[in-house]
C-alpha cells in the first residue's frame, strides 16, 4: 500500500509537468526544472525558521544588578591603561627616547600616572574654565589670566589624578580598564603618587599666589580640598560625579574672582551648569566600568540610576542647556551662542542614541564626544561676545 501511494504521488507530479509543457512549450521559454520532479513535501508550520537577533551581555541594560549576578571578569591587561590614547602614548615615547632606559620607564610611568597619555580629561576641565574667563572679561580675557588658568587646569588635573590613583590603589586592580595604571600595576609606589600630588598642588598654588588677588587665593584652598575629597567620595556616596563636578568647576569662581574681584550671580549659574556637565560625562564614563564597579564595591551614579540611566542623562542634558540659556540671557549673548547650544543639543542627542544598547565602547565614545560639546559652547560664546 505504501508503494502504491508513492507511485501515485510521482504519477501526479509527472501529469502536472506534462500539462504545463503543453501550455508552455520549450520554444516559448518554458523549461522544466529539477524542482518539478520532486515529491511534494509537507511543512510543519511550528518548525519554520524564525529570525533570531543575538543580543550580547553588553547590550542588555544593567538593571538592579548585584555583583553575584555578573559573569566572571576577564583577566585584565596590566601592561598599560586600557583607555590610553595611542597618539599621546607615542608622543610620550618620542619625547623620552633620549633618556636612559631606567629613567625613561620611571618618567613614562609618572606621566601616565597624571594622565598625560589621556588629555581628554584636561580638555573637559579646560572648556568651562574658558567659559568663565570670557564671561568675566566680557570678551577676550587678559593674557596673564588666560595663561595662568590654562596652565593651572593641566597642573591641578594632574594632581587630582595622582591623588585619585592613590585613593583607588586597591580598587583599580579589580577594574579591567584601570588595572594597567602604574600604581595599580605596581610600577609606581603609593608614596611616589602622594609626593607627585603635593608637588603639583604646590605648583598650582604658586601660580595663584603670584598672579592673582586675595579672593582668588582664598578660593584656591577650597578648590584643593575638593580635588582631594573626590577620590574618596566614591566609597561613601552614590554621587561622586557631583563631587567631581564641584571640584572640576571650582575654576569658574576663581576666574571671576581673579578678573572682577567678585562673585556675581552669573558665576554661580555657570558653576551649576558645570556641575551638570561633569555629572553627565562622568556618568557616561562610569557606565563603561559599571560591571567592574559592582564587583569591586565602588559607587557611582551609573549604578544608582540603573535602567533609568539614559532618561536621567537626557533630563540632565536638557537642564544643562536651559542653565546655559539663562547664562546667555544674563550676559546678553546674541544668536551665535544660541547656535552653539543648538549644536550641543544635537551632540547630546547623538550620545543618547549611540548608548542605546549600553555597550562599553559606545559609552566611552559618548564620554569623549563631550569635548566637542564644551568646545562648541565656548565658540558660540566667543563669537557672541565679539559681536556685542
Predicted segments, located by residue:
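Multi-pass membrane catalytic core of lipid/isoprenoid biosynthesis enzymes
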Residues: 125-126, 148-153, 169-220, 295-335, ...
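Extended hydrophobic alpha-helices typical of membrane-associated regions
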Residues: 108, 322, 326-388
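Transit-peptide-like, low-complexity N-terminal presequences
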Residues: 40-112
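Cytosolic, membrane-interface loops and tails of multi-pass inner-membrane proteins
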Residues: 91-108, 161-188, 283-306, 354-362
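Small-residue-rich segments of transmembrane alpha-helices in multi-pass membrane proteins
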Residues: 124-131, 244-257, 304, 368-381
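Intramembrane alpha-helical segments
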Residues: 111-112, 181-269, 326, 349-357
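Membrane-embedded alpha-helical segments that form the functional core of polytopic membrane enzymes
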Residues: 129-130, 134-167, 177, 201-206, ...
